[in-house]
From Swiss-Prot:
Compartments (UniProt record): Cell outer membrane; Cell surface
One Pfam family here: Lipoprotein_1
Coiled-coil portions: none
Family per similarity comment: Belongs to the OspA lipoprotein family.
Residues lipid-modified (N-palmitoyl cysteine): 17
Entry keyword S-adenosyl-L-methionine: no
Protein name as it appears in the record: Outer surface protein A
Leader sequence residues: 1-16
Lipid moiety-binding residues (S-diacylglycerol cysteine): 17
Matching InterPro entries: OM_lipoprot_Borrelia (IPR001809), OM_lipoprot_dom_sf (IPR023322)
Gene Ontology cellular-component annotations: cell outer membrane; cell surface
Length: 273
């Protein structure tokens, strides 16, 4: 009789372990906040394999997994109604989450979102072949860098969405070139894969007396515009992803007044006149 009861108890214990993930609730688990406004439930006790159970719901998809740690890190997986697969990877230090959607084969990517603790994120969309077709990188301050109409060679359209206006251009191999044109003047802003910014000015005007030139100082992120070797305007591309403008005096030697933030694309074009 004792052996029978022990056997029943063992079976019930094994069933409880197997059901650990699906039965997670407020009583037997702890809720952990994650980057990307996500939450994961972590079991308070280990299962029969010595693992902690994980459970999360993302975009109405129930995800389950296990982990050696009890802090919420690990890999969770689930299946949508259309049989496509979902995967959530939580970094060991909880600093980053990666949420991926795959086709039914579980290999061909449909979309991917990487969210970091510093409020930055990267959203990627993929075509039928699993190739990158669009990408949006959101910075900590809310400004964005967007790639669209991406081709297999890494080229496509680019757009930088600033606080008050947008700059447009192209991307090639993760190097972005944005342009603003006003008359014969073209302002070019290049953003390298590392995030380093370089700004240049080109003027097709053939009259030397009115031809504009630009000198870029990478240390201060400043573009100084001159006409016939005389400084006229200073544009500063700040770390907050804003642009300020300040004029020089008639002699071109000293800056006048204070720097003013450019809030519209027309204001930026006016600074190039």
């Amino acid at each position: 009789m004792k052996k029978y009861l022990l056997g029943i108890g063992l079976i019930l214990a094994l069933i409880a372990c197997k059901q650990n993930v699906s039965s997670l609730d407020e009583k037997n688990s702890a809720s952990v906040d994650l980057p990307g406004e996500m939450k994961v439930l972590v079991s308070k006790e280990k299962d029969k394999d010595g693992k902690y159970s994980l459970k999360a719901t993302v975009d109405k998809i129930e995800l389950k997994g296990t982990s050696d740690k009890d802090n919420g890190s690990g890999v969770l997986e689930g299946t949508k109604d259309d049989k496509s697969k979902a995967k959530l990877t939580i970094a060991d230090d909880l600093s980053k989450t990666t949420f991926e959607l795959f086709k039914e084969d579980g290999k061909t990517l449909v979309s991917r979102k990487v969210s970091s603790k510093d409020k930055t994120s990267t959203d990627e969309m993929f075509n039928e072949k699993g190739e990158l077709s669009a990408k949006t990188m959101t910075r900590e301050n809310g400004t964005k860098l967007e790639y669209t109409e991406m081709k297999s060679d890494g080229t496509g359209k680019a757009k930088e969405v600033l606080k008050n206006f947008t700059l447009e251009g192209k991307v090639a191999n993760d190097k972005v070139t944005l342009e603003v044109k006003e008359g014969t003047v073209t302002l070019s802003k290049e953003i390298a894969k590392s995030g380093e910014v370089t700004v240049a000015l080109n003027d097709t005007n053939t009259t030397q007396a009115t031809k504009k030139t630009g000198a870029w100082d990478s240390k201060t992120s400043t573009l100084t515009i001159s006409v016939n070797s005389k400084k006229t305007t200073q544009l500063v591309f700040t770390k907050q992803d804003t642009i300020t403008v300040q004029k020089y005096d008639s002699a071109g030697t000293n800056l006048e007044g204070t720097a003013v933030e450019i809030k519209t694309l027309d204001e930026l074009k006016n600074a190039l006149k």
